Amino acid sequence: MAAPQPLQKGDRILILKERWLGLILSGDKTMEIRSKRLRAGKYYLGYKEKIYGCVSIGLPVPITTIEQWRTLYPRHLVNSSTLPYERTFGLPILSVRSLEGTYKHPKGAIGIVKYR
């Protein structure tokens, strides 16, 4: 992945918990799990109003069975015997790059926000 440019208005930021952020940045977690089918492309990785990295996400993979969920475990690393969402999607992480910056988002924002 080319060096990320400074954040622009409208850039997408995935809001993550600290554990998942660390696993993605280390390269151990290669699939993010979401309840929505996010578009492929560039996303910044955010935690507590800071940017820690940038990823390129591939086309979303619908996860519809427990067997598929278990097979994908080495990529998503979510330790659960059931699907986490009624509609579950795996977002393949094609590349990741660490960086730091700050951003603000609306109070209580979860999941994904756009840079303002």
What do the PLM-derived regions correspond to, one by one?
Residues 2-116:
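Structured alpha/beta reader/binder surfaces that contact nucleic acids or chromatin modification marks
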